[in-house]
Amino acid sequence: MIEGILKEGFITTSYDSVMNWAKTGSLWPMSFGLACCAVEMMHAANARYDISRFGAEVFRASPRQSDLIIVAGTLCNKMAPAFRKVYDQMSEPRRVISMGSCANGGGYYHYSYSVVRGCDRIVPVDVYVPGCPPTAEALLYGIIQLQHKIRRTQTIARA
């Protein structure tokens, strides 16, 4: 991130590096717990796993205050329009973590008529966390992967 340190005490770096560093340490998640994966998401927020180490300390109740949504559980056809509405109300840049087999591809209920076979059919997903249910460690690993993805993005378009 730091490209050079001058003798006068200045640090030179790019705008993208500074902005992406700030974004990785200030993820504001919103829980969208639909099934048993939500329990593991709650475990990740407890003191044992301490999700605040990664900058995702407080789960927001309002989509307008969050920039990350963690979809944990089975997304049904009736819930899909409400989920899309919540996603549209989130602040930019929006990020989505799909947590668990049901959110990733329908899971155990894949062949049911009322289940959306993956939340990526409704919103774009950044990180998939596999498992049924995935452990709290797997969710933390997914957050770390999202942070790596944020660091690789470019804020300023290059010509």
Curated annotation (Swiss-Prot):
Entry cofactors: [4Fe-4S] cluster
Cofactor info, note text: Binds 1 [4Fe-4S] cluster.
Enzyme class, first EC level, given as a word: translocase
InterPro entries linked: NADH_UbQ_OxRdtase-like_20kDa, NADH_UQ_OxRdtase_20Kd_su
SUPFAM superfamilies hit by this protein: HydA/Nqo6-like
EC number(s) given by UniProt: 7.1.1.-
MF terms (GO), sorted A to Z: 4 iron, 4 sulfur cluster binding; iron ion binding; NADH dehydrogenase (ubiquinone) activity; NADH:ubiquinone reductase (non-electrogenic) activity; quinone binding
Top-level taxonomic group: Bacteria
Binding site for [4Fe-4S] cluster: 36-37, 102, 132
Catalytic activity: a quinone + NADH + 5 H(+)(in) = a quinol + NAD(+) + 4 H(+)(out)
Biological function: NDH-1 shuttles electrons from NADH, via FMN and iron-sulfur (Fe-S) centers, to quinones in the respiratory chain. Couples the redox reaction to proton translocation (for every two electrons transferred, four hydrogen ions are translocated across the cytoplasmic membrane), and thus conserves the redox energy in a proton gradient.
Quaternary structure and interacting proteins, as annotated: NDH-1 is composed of 14 different subunits. Subunits NuoB, C, D, E, F, and G constitute the peripheral sector of the complex.
Protein name: NADH-quinone oxidoreductase subunit B
Top-level taxonomy: Bacteria, Pseudomonadati, Pseudomonadota, Betaproteobacteria, Burkholderiales
